[in-house]
Structure formats: C-alpha cells, structure tokens
C-alpha cells in the first residue's frame, strides 16, 4: 500500500509544506515540497485568504492521505500565538473540507523522530531531512520551514507505522 503524507509548518509569513510518498516495505521518498510566502504588507485577513487558497490548490492537485501540523505552542507574545493559531485553523479547514485527516505533533516529537533528540536545532533537522530523503536543497537557509514540514511528515509515518503494528 502506498501513502502520501503532507507535513505543514504553519506561519503568517511563510508556511512550508512537504509531501512524502511511502511505498511498501516502508520506503520513504520526497514527493513534492514548497513554501507559501506571504507579504507582510498585506493584512492578516488577506494573508489567511491567500494561505487557504494556495494550500487548497496543493491539496486538490495532490490529495494526500493525511495532513500533519505542529501542535499549538505559546509564544512570549500572546498576539503571535493568536495569529499563528488562526493560520493553523485556516490550514486545518482546507484539509477538513476535503475530508483529509489531520494529525498534530509537538515540535520536539517531530525533531526526535528525525534527529533523535527533541531539542535539535533547525540546522540539524535540515541536515537529517536532506540525508533521509536525499534532497540537498533543504539545506538552504530559506528552506527551514520546508525541512520542518518534512520532519512532521516523517514523524507521522513512523508513528502510524507503529500504530498499525499495535505498538503505542
């Protein structure tokens, strides 16, 4: 059975997305990836609309079996937390309208699944994602969000594989 899993690293300026393809015998490869870049000059409402429309287009083109996001975490600035939460809501809605199941993992859980430690740096995540999937492009400094999205997708692939085996 093959499966497509989409990881999304949400943001109000940049949202990275990454789709992995899982083949029989648990072979993982990169399917596609990208970043939705939004202008800080646009209103938040306009950015949320663009985020929704762009991700909806990707979901319509690819139709993944699952969408994976980071769990909400609290920033020092409450307004940042609220704005990010709204971006997450837009992304969840885009998947829900297409009946695509949504899963969430804490950032440290995704990092542990890819790097082996939950407090890994962004650069360590990028390095391991590039090695696991053999895509050196994610080592670029402007690809941190994409690497995080890949980490979330890989984390879900590992977790769902163990769940299917009855391991919790």
Swiss-Prot record:
Pfam families: RuvC. Mg(2+) 2 binds at residue 70. Disulfide bonds: none annotated. GO terms for cellular component: cytoplasm; Holliday junction resolvase complex. It catalyses: Endonucleolytic cleavage at a junction such as a reciprocal single-stranded crossover between two homologous DNA duplexes (Holliday junction). It is an enzyme of class 3 (hydrolase). InterPro entries: RNaseH-like_sf, RNaseH_sf, X-over_junc_endoDNase_Mg_BS, X-over_junc_endoDNase_RuvC. Binds 2 Mg(2+) ion per subunit. Its EC number is 3.1.21.10. Homodimer which binds Holliday junction (HJ) DNA. The HJ becomes 2-fold symmetrical on binding to RuvC with unstacked arms; it has a different conformation from HJ DNA in complex with RuvA. In the full resolvosome a probable DNA-RuvA(4)-RuvB(12)-RuvC(2) complex forms which resolves the HJ. This is Crossover junction endodeoxyribonuclease RuvC. It comes from Chlamydia caviae (strain ATCC VR-813 / DSM 19441 / 03DC25 / GPIC) (Chlamydophila caviae).
